[in-house]
Protein backbone atom coordinates (compact mmCIF):
# COMPACT_ATOMS: atom_id res chain seq x y z
CA UNK A 1 0.00 0.00 0.00
CA UNK A 2 0.99 3.59 -0.60
CA UNK A 3 0.63 6.13 2.19
CA UNK A 4 1.42 9.84 2.47
CA UNK A 5 3.42 11.99 4.85
CA UNK A 6 4.00 15.67 5.55
CA UNK A 7 7.63 16.30 4.65
CA UNK A 8 7.84 20.12 4.62
CA UNK A 9 5.94 23.00 6.23
CA UNK A 10 6.00 26.75 5.58
CA UNK A 11 4.06 29.93 6.26
CA UNK A 12 4.03 33.57 5.21
CA UNK A 13 2.22 36.65 6.48
CA UNK A 14 2.04 40.22 5.16
CA UNK A 15 4.39 42.72 6.77
CA UNK A 16 1.69 45.17 7.91
CA UNK A 17 0.71 44.47 11.53
CA UNK A 18 -2.44 46.00 13.00
CA UNK A 19 -2.69 45.98 16.80
CA UNK A 20 -5.83 46.16 18.88
CA UNK A 21 -4.86 49.73 19.76
CA UNK A 22 -4.70 50.54 16.04
CA UNK A 23 -8.25 49.25 15.65
CA UNK A 24 -9.40 51.38 18.56
CA UNK A 25 -8.52 54.43 16.43
CA UNK A 26 -11.07 53.53 13.75
CA UNK A 27 -13.87 51.87 15.74
CA UNK A 28 -15.39 51.78 19.21
CA UNK A 29 -13.20 49.13 20.82
CA UNK A 30 -10.08 48.71 22.95
CA UNK A 31 -7.19 46.32 23.43
CA UNK A 32 -8.73 45.06 26.67
CA UNK A 33 -12.15 44.47 25.09
CA UNK A 34 -10.70 42.44 22.21
CA UNK A 35 -8.02 40.47 24.05
CA UNK A 36 -10.23 39.52 27.00
CA UNK A 37 -12.95 38.14 24.71
CA UNK A 38 -10.83 36.53 21.99
CA UNK A 39 -7.19 36.23 23.01
CA UNK A 40 -6.24 38.23 19.90
CA UNK A 41 -3.70 41.05 20.28
CA UNK A 42 -2.75 41.82 16.68
CA UNK A 43 -3.17 40.60 13.13
CA UNK A 44 -1.36 40.88 9.78
CA UNK A 45 -3.16 42.78 7.03
CA UNK A 46 -2.23 42.76 3.36
CA UNK A 47 -2.01 46.19 1.75
CA UNK A 48 -0.67 45.09 -1.65
CA UNK A 49 -0.41 41.30 -1.87
CA UNK A 50 -3.35 39.20 -2.99
CA UNK A 51 -4.22 35.72 -1.74
CA UNK A 52 -2.27 34.13 -4.59
CA UNK A 53 0.82 36.17 -3.69
CA UNK A 54 0.77 34.80 -0.14
CA UNK A 55 0.24 31.25 -1.40
CA UNK A 56 3.08 31.60 -3.91
CA UNK A 57 5.48 32.62 -1.13
CA UNK A 58 4.54 29.49 0.81
CA UNK A 59 4.91 27.28 -2.27
CA UNK A 60 8.37 28.69 -2.96
CA UNK A 61 9.45 27.99 0.62
CA UNK A 62 8.15 24.43 0.47
CA UNK A 63 10.05 23.73 -2.73
CA UNK A 64 13.23 25.35 -1.43
CA UNK A 65 13.10 23.25 1.72
CA UNK A 66 12.50 20.03 -0.17
CA UNK A 67 15.04 20.46 -2.94
CA UNK A 68 12.45 19.44 -5.54
CA UNK A 69 11.96 21.28 -8.79
CA UNK A 70 8.40 22.50 -9.28
CA UNK A 71 8.01 20.10 -12.21
CA UNK A 72 8.16 17.21 -9.70
CA UNK A 73 4.78 18.23 -8.24
CA UNK A 74 1.69 16.29 -9.26
CA UNK A 75 -0.96 18.54 -7.72
CA UNK A 76 -1.55 21.83 -5.89
CA UNK A 77 -4.59 22.42 -3.69
CA UNK A 78 -5.29 25.85 -2.20
CA UNK A 79 -7.94 26.17 0.50
CA UNK A 80 -9.40 29.68 0.58
CA UNK A 81 -12.61 31.69 0.93
CA UNK A 82 -10.89 34.88 -0.28
CA UNK A 83 -9.50 34.05 -3.74
CA UNK A 84 -8.17 36.71 -6.09
CA UNK A 85 -11.09 35.95 -8.41
CA UNK A 86 -13.67 33.26 -9.09
CA UNK A 87 -11.45 32.15 -11.96
CA UNK A 88 -8.72 31.38 -12.61
CA UNK A 89 -8.33 29.60 -9.30
CA UNK A 90 -5.75 30.70 -6.77
CA UNK A 91 -4.10 27.29 -7.14
CA UNK A 92 -3.78 27.81 -10.90
CA UNK A 93 -2.00 31.10 -10.26
CA UNK A 94 0.39 29.34 -7.88
CA UNK A 95 1.01 26.61 -10.45
CA UNK A 96 1.90 29.18 -13.11
CA UNK A 97 4.08 31.30 -10.83
CA UNK A 98 6.29 28.45 -9.63
CA UNK A 99 6.40 26.60 -12.96
CA UNK A 100 4.69 23.41 -11.79
CA UNK A 101 3.87 22.42 -15.36
CA UNK A 102 3.08 18.79 -14.51
CA UNK A 103 0.68 19.57 -11.66
CA UNK A 104 -3.09 19.90 -11.79
CA UNK A 105 -4.37 22.62 -9.47
CA UNK A 106 -7.66 23.57 -7.87
CA UNK A 107 -9.13 25.51 -4.96
CA UNK A 108 -11.00 24.05 -2.00
CA UNK A 109 -13.79 26.13 -0.45
CA UNK A 110 -14.61 24.88 3.04
CA UNK A 111 -13.96 28.02 5.09
CA UNK A 112 -12.03 27.44 8.31
CA UNK A 113 -12.11 23.67 7.75
CA UNK A 114 -10.60 24.11 4.29
CA UNK A 115 -7.04 23.08 5.05
CA UNK A 116 -8.12 19.92 6.88
CA UNK A 117 -10.52 18.98 4.06
CA UNK A 118 -7.83 19.66 1.44
CA UNK A 119 -5.21 17.66 3.33
CA UNK A 120 -7.60 14.72 3.62
CA UNK A 121 -8.25 14.83 -0.13
CA UNK A 122 -4.53 15.08 -0.91
CA UNK A 123 -3.83 12.04 1.26
CA UNK A 124 -6.31 10.05 -0.85
CA UNK A 125 -4.74 11.26 -4.10
CA UNK A 126 -1.36 9.89 -3.06
CA UNK A 127 -2.85 6.72 -1.55
CA UNK A 128 -4.40 5.98 -4.96
CA UNK A 129 -0.90 5.36 -6.28
CA UNK A 130 -1.42 7.74 -9.20
CA UNK A 131 0.39 10.71 -7.65
CA UNK A 132 3.65 11.05 -5.74
CA UNK A 133 3.66 14.52 -4.23
CA UNK A 134 1.81 17.80 -4.04
CA UNK A 135 1.31 21.04 -2.16
CA UNK A 136 -1.61 21.74 0.17
CA UNK A 137 -1.88 25.43 1.07
CA UNK A 138 -4.34 27.48 3.12
CA UNK A 139 -4.26 31.16 2.12
CA UNK A 140 -6.50 34.10 2.96
CA UNK A 141 -6.79 37.87 2.59
CA UNK A 142 -9.86 38.18 4.78
CA UNK A 143 -9.28 41.92 5.20
CA UNK A 144 -10.98 42.46 1.84
CA UNK A 145 -14.23 40.72 2.83
CA UNK A 146 -14.57 42.31 6.28
CA UNK A 147 -16.87 45.23 7.08
CA UNK A 148 -14.43 47.46 8.93
CA UNK A 149 -17.33 49.27 10.58
CA UNK A 150 -18.60 46.06 12.18
CA UNK A 151 -16.79 45.64 15.49
CA UNK A 152 -18.13 42.14 16.02
CA UNK A 153 -16.19 40.75 13.04
CA UNK A 154 -13.49 43.30 12.15
CA UNK A 155 -11.48 42.63 15.31
CA UNK A 156 -11.30 38.88 14.70
CA UNK A 157 -9.69 38.28 11.34
CA UNK A 158 -6.29 38.55 9.69
CA UNK A 159 -4.41 37.65 6.51
CA UNK A 160 -1.80 34.96 5.93
CA UNK A 161 -0.90 31.63 4.36
CA UNK A 162 0.60 28.32 5.37
CA UNK A 163 1.06 24.96 3.76
CA UNK A 164 2.69 21.57 3.53
CA UNK A 165 4.43 19.37 1.00
CA UNK A 166 2.77 15.98 1.04
CA UNK A 167 4.52 13.01 -0.55
CA UNK A 168 4.35 9.24 -0.80
CA UNK A 169 5.55 7.10 2.09
CA UNK A 170 5.84 3.39 2.84
CA UNK A 171 4.62 3.99 6.40
CA UNK A 172 1.16 5.16 7.46
CA UNK A 173 1.10 8.69 8.87
CA UNK A 174 -2.58 9.62 8.51
CA UNK A 175 -4.18 7.50 11.22
CA UNK A 176 -7.79 8.71 11.42
CA UNK A 177 -10.12 11.29 9.94
CA UNK A 178 -13.63 12.65 10.34
CA UNK A 179 -15.10 15.26 8.00
CA UNK A 180 -18.55 16.82 8.46
CA UNK A 181 -20.90 19.36 6.91
CA UNK A 182 -24.26 20.68 8.09
CA UNK A 183 -25.61 22.96 5.39
CA UNK A 184 -28.85 23.48 7.31
CA UNK A 185 -26.94 25.78 9.65
CA UNK A 186 -25.00 27.51 6.89
CA UNK A 187 -26.50 30.95 7.44
CA UNK A 188 -24.71 31.22 10.78
CA UNK A 189 -21.57 32.28 8.92
CA UNK A 190 -21.64 33.75 5.42
CA UNK A 191 -19.61 35.92 3.05
CA UNK A 192 -19.46 36.84 -0.62
CA UNK A 193 -23.19 36.62 -1.23
CA UNK A 194 -24.23 37.76 -4.70
CA UNK A 195 -27.54 38.51 -6.36
CA UNK A 196 -28.87 37.58 -9.79
CA UNK A 197 -27.92 40.28 -12.27
CA UNK A 198 -29.17 39.93 -15.82
CA UNK A 199 -31.73 41.60 -18.08
CA UNK A 200 -34.09 38.73 -17.20
CA UNK A 201 -33.90 38.83 -13.41
CA UNK A 202 -34.82 41.23 -10.68
CA UNK A 203 -31.72 41.11 -8.51
CA UNK A 204 -31.80 42.45 -5.00
CA UNK A 205 -29.01 44.07 -3.03
CA UNK A 206 -27.17 41.71 -0.69
CA UNK A 207 -24.45 42.18 1.90
CA UNK A 208 -21.27 40.61 0.53
CA UNK A 209 -19.22 41.17 3.70
CA UNK A 210 -18.50 38.35 6.13
CA UNK A 211 -21.36 38.02 8.61
CA UNK A 212 -21.40 35.77 11.65
CA UNK A 213 -23.76 34.71 14.40
CA UNK A 214 -21.06 34.58 17.05
CA UNK A 215 -23.10 32.77 19.70
CA UNK A 216 -24.25 30.08 17.26
CA UNK A 217 -20.69 29.45 16.06
CA UNK A 218 -19.36 29.37 19.63
CA UNK A 219 -21.97 26.81 20.69
CA UNK A 220 -21.38 24.75 17.54
CA UNK A 221 -17.64 24.55 18.23
CA UNK A 222 -18.05 23.56 21.86
CA UNK A 223 -20.75 20.96 21.19
CA UNK A 224 -20.27 19.43 17.73
CA UNK A 225 -16.54 19.86 17.20
CA UNK A 226 -15.63 18.64 20.69
CA UNK A 227 -17.82 15.56 20.17
CA UNK A 228 -16.17 14.86 16.81
CA UNK A 229 -12.67 15.19 18.26
CA UNK A 230 -13.49 12.78 21.07
CA UNK A 231 -14.86 10.31 18.51
CA UNK A 232 -11.85 10.48 16.20
CA UNK A 233 -9.45 9.88 19.08
CA UNK A 234 -11.39 6.73 19.94
CA UNK A 235 -11.44 5.75 16.26
CA UNK A 236 -7.65 6.06 16.01
CA UNK A 237 -7.03 3.54 18.77
CA UNK A 238 -4.72 5.99 20.52
CA UNK A 239 -5.10 6.90 24.16
CA UNK A 240 -5.54 10.62 24.79
CA UNK A 241 -2.16 10.58 26.50
CA UNK A 242 -0.52 9.45 23.26
CA UNK A 243 -1.51 12.66 21.48
CA UNK A 244 1.39 15.08 21.77
CA UNK A 245 -0.45 18.21 20.62
CA UNK A 246 -3.77 19.39 19.22
CA UNK A 247 -3.70 22.10 16.55
CA UNK A 248 -7.19 23.52 16.26
CA UNK A 249 -8.49 26.34 14.11
CA UNK A 250 -7.43 29.59 15.79
CA UNK A 251 -10.80 31.27 16.18
CA UNK A 252 -10.98 32.31 19.81
CA UNK A 253 -9.05 31.47 22.99
CA UNK A 254 -12.28 30.97 24.95
CA UNK A 255 -13.30 28.27 22.48
CA UNK A 256 -10.01 26.43 23.01
CA UNK A 257 -10.36 26.73 26.79
CA UNK A 258 -13.84 25.22 26.79
CA UNK A 259 -13.01 22.54 24.23
CA UNK A 260 -10.04 21.35 26.28
CA UNK A 261 -12.35 20.83 29.26
CA UNK A 262 -15.05 19.21 27.13
CA UNK A 263 -12.61 16.77 25.54
CA UNK A 264 -10.84 16.15 28.83
CA UNK A 265 -7.27 16.94 27.81
CA UNK A 266 -4.63 19.26 29.30
CA UNK A 267 -4.98 22.82 28.01
CA UNK A 268 -1.23 23.06 27.40
CA UNK A 269 -1.53 20.44 24.66
CA UNK A 270 -3.69 22.84 22.63
CA UNK A 271 -1.18 24.96 20.70
CA UNK A 272 -2.16 28.52 19.87
CA UNK A 273 -0.94 31.61 18.05
CA UNK A 274 -4.15 33.57 17.53
CA UNK A 275 -2.70 36.34 19.68
CA UNK A 276 -0.30 37.18 16.82
CA UNK A 277 -2.47 36.51 13.76
CA UNK A 278 -6.15 36.53 14.68
CA UNK A 279 -8.47 34.20 12.79
CA UNK A 280 -6.97 33.47 9.36
CA UNK A 281 -9.62 30.91 8.37
CA UNK A 282 -8.13 28.20 6.12
CA UNK A 283 -4.61 29.49 6.83
CA UNK A 284 -4.78 29.24 10.62
CA UNK A 285 -3.90 25.55 11.06
CA UNK A 286 -1.01 25.44 8.55
CA UNK A 287 0.46 28.66 9.97
CA UNK A 288 0.29 27.15 13.47
CA UNK A 289 1.76 23.88 12.19
CA UNK A 290 4.66 25.64 10.47
CA UNK A 291 5.41 27.87 13.45
CA UNK A 292 5.35 24.89 15.80
CA UNK A 293 7.95 23.11 13.67
CA UNK A 294 9.97 26.31 13.44
CA UNK A 295 10.07 26.75 17.23
CA UNK A 296 10.87 23.09 17.89
CA UNK A 297 7.61 21.97 19.48
CA UNK A 298 6.97 19.68 16.53
CA UNK A 299 9.86 17.63 15.19
CA UNK A 300 8.66 16.50 11.75
CA UNK A 301 10.60 13.26 12.25
CA UNK A 302 7.70 10.84 12.61
CA UNK A 303 7.95 10.64 16.39
CA UNK A 304 4.84 12.64 17.38
CA UNK A 305 1.08 12.24 17.08
CA UNK A 306 -0.92 15.40 16.47
CA UNK A 307 -4.58 16.19 15.90
CA UNK A 308 -5.58 18.85 13.37
CA UNK A 309 -9.12 20.18 13.59
CA UNK A 310 -10.86 22.91 11.61
CA UNK A 311 -14.39 24.26 11.99
CA UNK A 312 -16.37 27.11 10.49
CA UNK A 313 -18.57 28.21 7.61
CA UNK A 314 -20.75 25.67 5.87
CA UNK A 315 -21.13 24.70 8.59
CA UNK A 316 -18.10 22.45 8.25
CA UNK A 317 -15.84 20.69 10.70
CA UNK A 318 -13.18 18.07 10.34
CA UNK A 319 -10.26 16.45 12.15
CA UNK A 320 -7.21 14.41 11.24
CA UNK A 321 -4.83 12.48 13.47
CA UNK A 322 -1.39 12.49 11.90
CA UNK A 323 1.98 11.02 12.78
CA UNK A 324 4.42 13.80 12.09
UniProtKB/Swiss-Prot annotation:
One of its GO terms (molecular function) is 3-oxoacyl-[acyl-carrier-protein] synthase activity. The active site is at 112, 249, 279. It catalyses: malonyl-[ACP] + acetyl-CoA + H(+) = 3-oxobutanoyl-[ACP] + CO2 + CoA. Pathway: Lipid metabolism; fatty acid biosynthesis. Its main location: cytoplasm. The keyword Lipid biosynthesis applies. It comes from the Bacteria. GO terms for biological process: fatty acid biosynthetic process. Keywords: Acyltransferase, Cytoplasm, Fatty acid biosynthesis, Fatty acid metabolism, Lipid biosynthesis, Lipid metabolism, Multifunctional enzyme, Transferase. One of its GO terms (cellular component) is cytoplasm. InterPro entries: ACP_syn_III_C, ACP_syn_III_N, FabH, Thiolase-like. The last Arg residue of the ACP-binding site is essential for the weak association between ACP/AcpP and FabH. Catalyzes the condensation reaction of fatty acid synthesis by the addition to an acyl acceptor of two carbons from malonyl-ACP. Catalyzes the first condensation reaction which initiates fatty acid synthesis and may therefore play a role in governing the total rate of fatty acid production. Possesses both acetoacetyl-ACP synthase and acetyl transacylase activities. Its substrate specificity determines the biosynthesis of branched-chain and/or straight-chain of fatty acids. Homodimer. Belongs to the thiolase-like superfamily. FabH family. PANTHER family: 3-OXOACYL-[ACYL-CARRIER-PROTEIN] SYNTHASE, BETA-KETOACYL-[ACYL-CARRIER-PROTEIN] SYNTHASE III, CHLOROPLASTIC. This is Beta-ketoacyl-[acyl-carrier-protein] synthase III. It comes from Streptococcus equi subsp. zooepidemicus (strain H70). The lineage of its organism: Bacteria, Bacillati, Bacillota, Bacilli, Lactobacillales. The gene is fabH.
Amino acid sequence: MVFSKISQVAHYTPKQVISNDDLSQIMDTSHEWISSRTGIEKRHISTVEMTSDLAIRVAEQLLAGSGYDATALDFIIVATISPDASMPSTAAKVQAAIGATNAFAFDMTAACSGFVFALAMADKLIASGAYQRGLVIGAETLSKIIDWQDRSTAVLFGDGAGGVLLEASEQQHFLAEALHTDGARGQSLTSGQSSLRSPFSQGQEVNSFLQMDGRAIFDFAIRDVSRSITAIIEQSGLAKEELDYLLLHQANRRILDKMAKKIGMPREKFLENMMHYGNTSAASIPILLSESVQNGQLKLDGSQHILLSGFGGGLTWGSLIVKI
